[in-house]
Amino acid sequence: MSSPILNTDDNNCVRVALRVRPLSKKEEAERSMEVVKYVDGEPQVIMGDNNQTFTFDYVFNGKSRQQEIFDDCVANLVDCLFEGYNSTILAYGQTGSGKTFTMGTTSTIGIPTEELGVIPRVIDFIYDKIDRKKDTHQLVLKVSFLELYNEEIRDMLNPYPTAGGLPIREKSNGEVYIPGLVEQIVRSRQQMEEALIRGSQSRTTGSTLMNSHSSRSHAIFSIIVEQTPINSPVTSSSTSSTSTSSSSDDKKQSKGKKKKKSSSPDSLSPNKDDDSSIMIDEDEEDDEEDEDDDIMSMDERNPSIRSMFHFVDLAGSERVKKTKAEGQRLKEGININGGLLALGNVISALGDTRRATTKPKHIPYRDSKLTRMLQSSLGGNSKTLMIACVSPADSNFEETLNTLKYAYRARNIMNKPVVNIDPVTQQILTYKTQIQTLKELLEKCTCRDIGDINSILASIPTVSIPPAPPLSTPTLTNNNNNNSSSNNNNNSNNNKLNVGGNNSGFSRTPSSSSLPPTNSSKSSIVKMNNSRNISSSSSSSSSSSSSSSLTTTPSITNNTATPSPTSVIVTNLSKEKEKEIFDLGMKVSQLEFENNMLQDISNKITSKYKALANRSRQLEEISQNFINNFSPNKDQTYFNELFEQFNSVLNQPTISPITPMMAAVSTQISSSNVIINSNSLLPMAEDNLLPGGKLESINNNNNNNNNSSEGIELFENDSEELSDLNQYISEKEEELELISKTKQQYQQMKEQFDQKVKELQSQLEEVTVEKDQALKELDKDKDKDKDNKDKDQYYEDEKLRLTQHYEKKLNELKQQLDQHAGSNKKDYQRLLDLKRKSEEKIDSLQQDIKDTKRQKSDLLKKMRDELKKRDDAKQTQAKELDALKREARKTEVIIDQLKNQSKKKDLLLQKKTDESESYKKKLKEIEVHKQRVIQPINSKSIPSNNNNNNSSGSVKSSNGSTASSASSANSSSSSSSSSSTNTSTTSTSATNNTTTSTSTSTPTTEQLNRKLLHRKSINVPYWREWLIHQIQKNLEKNELTELLQREFKNKEIFVRQANDLKKAFTSVPSKLSKSEYNEQSQFLETNIKLQNEKILKSQKDLTIISNDCLDSPEILRMVSNTSFDKLPKLIQSSIELCIEYAEINRKNQQIKFINVPTPPTLQSQQQHQKSQHFYIQPPQPLQSQQQQQEKQQKQSNSEQVLEQRSSTSDLLEGIKLAISESNNKNNINNNNNNVNIAKSQPILPSQQQLSSSQELAEEYTSPSTSSLGMKLDQLLDEIKLDKEKREKNKLLNGYPPMSGINYFNPPTPQPLSASSFLTSAAATTTTTTTTTTTTNKQQVPKSFAPLNNTNNNNNNNNSSPLLLISDDKLDHSVFDKDLLDVDILGNDSSNNGFSVININSNNNITIKKPPSSPTRPHRKTTSLQSSPLSLSLESGLATALANNGNNNNNSNNNDVFTRLASQPRPDSRLKKYRDKLNTDDYLMAIKRNMNREDENFMRCNWTFNGHDGGLLTLVLDEQNPSTLYSGGSDKNIKLWDLHTGDNMLDLSSPGPVRSLCINGSSGCMFSGGAERTVKVWDIRSPGNTNLCIFKTPSDVNCLVTYGNYVVSGLENGTFKVWDIRHMQKPLKTPLTTTPHHTGTIFSMSVTSKYLVTGSRDHTINLFHRDSFVLAQKLQPPHHDGVTSIAVLDDVIYSGSRDRTIKRWDVSSINNLINNNGENNSNNLITTQLAQQTVPILSNTPSNSNLIINNNNNIINNNNNNNNSSNNNKSSSAPSSTTSSLSSSLDNSTFSLLNQYQQNRLLNNAHNDWVNCLCIHNGMIFSGGKDSNIKGWDPLLSSNSLLLGHESSISCLTSSKEFLFSGSTDKCIKIWKC
């Protein structure tokens, strides 16, 4: 037996199984989506939108069962447990992912069998295997259960646990154990299950928001198996005698099997002596013993094994923000996450693939107790399975992704499992092996049988042996202890190397046979090849050790007794052994030579293999290219070229790798007399060729290369470019080398030149020195001969000669030097230039080389990236192709199913058709038979039943036949219908009972008679009632169908919003927080449930009604079954019914909007302040009018108001019909009837109203003509001059003139009939108050003429019709900038908030309307969408009011022009009032007004100072009115507490804050400014945290929010729009994609329908609120930038830098008739009105007195006091003018609806720019650059001036009680009445 085996196969990797649980009920309720996708047929999953793919060993979806997981993953681990390996199952995942359910660590009581986890199934499986192995093994089972709670180890099976937990210890071999842990012995599966239940009940659990039964600790349940074969030794000591006897018994049993080895190849070697034959026999015996070892059972090799199975149920990771854990739960979660973090670090370190190639990395096992306990399971002695449990819900996306990453990384962990043998048993096996080895050695050396040896050994007295092994060689002991038991079985015939000497054969050396078989022959050869010295030394030491071990026994015996025969034998053998050792040394050297030879062969084979692999790859590339590019349309040349490529590759000369190897081997063997068995050569060559299994890796690489051959073909261009770069680099390097050589040549030339120069200079110096020396010698000689004068001359001559000589020589040298320098100067300069150029060239070449190499590296990187992309694309395409194939297969299956269904339906249809034909035939027979039976009955039954008929009146004799025929028809119809309904029944009975005759299926005579009597009792219009019933049912069905469709659409909207919300939440990064997502999803889910309930209810109702309704085929069938004589009656009833329905529909449309109630009382008016009305009533004193109103109001309570249609044409018809009916009633009853026309409109929230005394209306009349005087003429002259100037300015500025009418010479007005007036008045509405009369009685139709015709203006006759018109529908008129800026309203309060039109007997009409005062809230008016045809003029209307003389008792205060002359407003644009704004007296008056005790006057109550710069914007939180937000140029946003006046918080901004807005629904505030950003602040949080920042292309000037949208106006004239629900990116809308303004956006506001924008380009644009489509551009524009916009009740007010304020409203046409004005002054007003005549009416005939003012009012200006010429023109006017005007108005009304027009212009509203506008309590407040604040009434007719700030007013805002203003003087002021 041997030591434990190290398993090195692929199964040692940690196996990972992924289990995805199904969605929980909570997740389904939250409508969570599954984010985990599966790959069919592959253990892969795909996560998220990025399609991240993870591959595991096993993948189980939510539908997998527990049994599947056990069979696929766990069963093989149980088998490994009984083989002696440790096993571990590790459950990993987040909390609530199903780990405990999968492992089964909970109690098994009450759990169904199919839901049992892994542990209960393992227990059953273990005991099943124990039942099978109990006969051969002795098994002991133990269990332990522990938990790790808060880093404390607890024993779950110990009833008295240790305080503080159990420690962790480590053995010397690195194994971790826990001392004190209870290992309970279990003897049955019930005991083991009880231990599991008891431990699971003691485990710590808790409840969190994510899991109600969350495990709060890590649990490890362990099963320990100790198995011992029954026949194996279990004791730790045995005597040598028992060992030898057992060995001899084994040997004797094995000798019976030696015969089959007699023909071994070893016997073929020559054997010449006995020794050789003995050696062969011994070799045969060794082979047989090896075979015995091979067949030795596992039980005998592993006698005592202890293995463990660990089940680890980890606590799930959790996030505090999801679990909302606190206190102890929070501490538990922190400890759990800490342990799992350490586990993740261990997995990451072990799973790092670089550990195999780099330095081993530290594994942080000691960071946590959990990792220390799992040390053996992760990277140690265990076979481990990790079950990763995840949740598929998108809400757990991040946790699922992290779990998959760790699990995927765990697959790279390599374990080292070994068979766990008991160490005592292992030592015994070692001793047995040594004893057996010694016996074999003695048997070979002594040539004796094993029995003789045993007897000799038995006769030797035993001596105590020390515990050390018998063999003293440490190598032998180490080999025996370290090598595995399987090495004994690896010896085979194919691995034997037989070497023969000269005289004797050599099978196996004694030394090698004496060694234990530690390795197979393959590995031994390789080892000897690599380390021959070690082999030699080991063999020699082993032989010497064996000899020394053999000599120990004789030494013992010699000391105790005389020499025995055994000692003699041993002595002789020792000499032989010495000789054999020498022979072994020779053999070792010979094996070394063979090893070298085989290594050379291996190298050659490797090279040949590479060549063949290259050729194979080329062939596969060519074939793959042929497959990819194959097309039947290819030319023959293409195929020829392809075959040539094949032939060229195949014809390359190659040599078989086996042939040269065999040849070389045979050559070497023949030369060295060594014979190698060919059968053993091939595996040896394979091992030597590619050690370590590299052959398989090369094959794999070849496969990969084949798979990537397509990618290589795609990179041909890049390869060519790469080769060009390489060539370019080589060329540049050669050029650089050449230039470097040139530089060296230049250096050499320079050195030669310098050397030459130096030589010449040295020569010159030498000559000079020689000259000086010669002259010195001559002077010395001359000094010696001073006295000899004869020699003086000689010396002089000699000196001259020497001087000349040396001078000549010096000159020659200098000439040579100059010549050398001059000749080489050009060359030198040229060399210098060449040097400089070469250096530059070198630098450039080096730079080019660097650039080229960089390009090369970039290209290589690009090629790698492209290759990777293409591989990914191929994988994706392959997956898509597989998916498409699967879809195609599914589609084919569906098509086949549909075909089968179609065939079945065709067969069924054919069958039904045949049955129908048979039924028709039977029906015809029944009809014929019925007619035969009915005819004799009719003559008897009809007269006898005339008295019982239920019709209105008895049947006359004259038409008795008709009644009879009708009854007969009814009877036949009923019979046919009844027979048709019972057709199936009768036919079935006929087919089932063939004996029944045909007469049995038809009704009897008594039945027919009874049915006929029943039909005669029904009224004649039976078909009519039936048709009405069917029509009603079908109408109800259609209504329910439409309702159902609407509910479905609403549900689709909510579902779409829920999907968008879920995408926004699951996107990375998430756009919504969890709380926001839960809140919005809960709201959408509630709506969806509500819609489902509505849909279910509608479907039930529709089903009930559908059962009663007959469809078209059924109706046609009933009609076809009706007799011919009944058809005329049916057709007549149908046509009459259609006509009646059409007539009823027409009348309903006409009277749909008609109601005749009396006016409501004053109290009801106060309760319904959202609408105002016009009354048309006869003129009477005020007291009588009020009494009449009270009388009418009492009668109005019992009337019902009908709904009015929104269409203008329907409104005209309704008013005409109402007035005509009213006049007809006056003619009959001579009573006063009132017509009230009220349009039901959506009610908008109104302004706060004052007391009822302030709501009394005033009746306006013009003053007497004598009060006007010269002031009127002066005013008109000034208007005329001003108008001419403005017309010139308009022409210069590009504006066309208003109309082509001569303004001061208008045509003569044409009188307008009352019908035309009423038609036009009903078609339009107005908000201005006018009074006009008409006197042309001949033009009034008879239906409008009163019964009592009088001409007295004071007539109190109540017979005149009263028309009540809702003031909600009246629209304000349009003001042009050229009109007079005056107040035209008086202050009379004679009416109760109603506009009254009085019609007297002379058809004099007076219209009265209450004014609006700046001191009271403005009444909310909702304008009717009407046509902007005519331009209104309030001043002209005031002149028309002045012509009415009915209200002479009014004071002069109602005179507009008198008030204009007496009390001019300070902001009038008349020059004589402009200078008052700058006078000191005026300012003093304002200051005095500040202190007066008037409740309606605004005062400054508080001032805030805190900004370091000017105020730019203010905003008030509507949800929290006590908080004010301010932004300024100091880059701060300040929060002010309005209760205390304190600055609560400062919010910093990157730039000046120009605009603020608050969205109440989301609780967010948006700020914009000069840094091209929009910040979002959460004002609901305590610190107003900044949520996000949006980038904008330009600075933000203004912000506005409504609904879910936020709109920002930018400085570049564009807009940005965000949806609050998805604020990641701005929306792309028509507003943002198309430029609508050319200048900066200064201001924005919102109406009920439109988004209003004002810009620097002087324009105002209207966009639809939801679609952001341009609706209208307001004309005419301002003359400078629009700085501010305010909206009051959908009326738009705009302020501009041109110091004006404009009022814009929906335009309308109001036709007012005035027949009584005859004043010259009114002619002037008429002239002024004519100036503003609408261009569309410019073609009015010249004799028409019809004038349209700027309030869209048509005034027929013919008064009773006109001159005779005007009367003549009026009397001669044709009536065709009125009809043409009416038709033109009607036609133009529909084309110009919903258009905003300017109806008020306020020039010089301020002395400087109008910076801001604000609405407060129904008034308009404006702030200007002149530091003033002004308050205006809604009509901009009067104002109140507030002394504002010390500097420019920059912003205004308001609440219900206060007005807030901000200025550039850094102050905020609060104003209150």
From Swiss-Prot:
Domain Kinesin motor: 13-413
Keywords, alphabetical: ATP-binding, Cell cycle, Cell division, Coiled coil, Cytoplasm, Cytoskeleton, Microtubule, Mitosis, Motor protein, Nucleotide-binding, Repeat, Transport, WD repeat
Compositionally biased region (Acidic residues): 280-297
SUPFAM superfamilies reported for this sequence: P-loop containing nucleoside triphosphate hydrolases, WD40 repeat-like
Stored InterPro entries: G-protein_beta_WD-40_rep, Kinesin-like_fam, Kinesin_motor_CS, Kinesin_motor_dom, Kinesin_motor_dom_sf, P-loop_NTPase, WD40/YVTN_repeat-like_dom_sf, WD40_repeat_CS
Biased composition (Low complexity): 232-247, 473-567, 937-1005, 1182-1200, 1244-1254, 1348-1358, 1423-1454
Induction: Constitutively expressed.
Coiled-coil zones: 715-933
Cellular component GO terms, alphabetical: cytoplasm; kinesin complex; microtubule
Main subcellular location of this protein, as a coarse class: cytoplasm
Example GO molecular function: ATP hydrolysis activity
Any one GO biological process: cell division
Binding site for ATP: 93-100
WD repeats: 1506-1546, 1548-1587, 1589-1628, 1636-1673, 1677-1714, 1805-1842, 1844-1873
Family the UniProt entry places it in: Belongs to the TRAFAC class myosin-kinesin ATPase superfamily. Kinesin family.
The protein, known as: Kinesin-related protein 8
Protein's organism: Dictyostelium discoideum
Gene, per the UniProt record: kif8
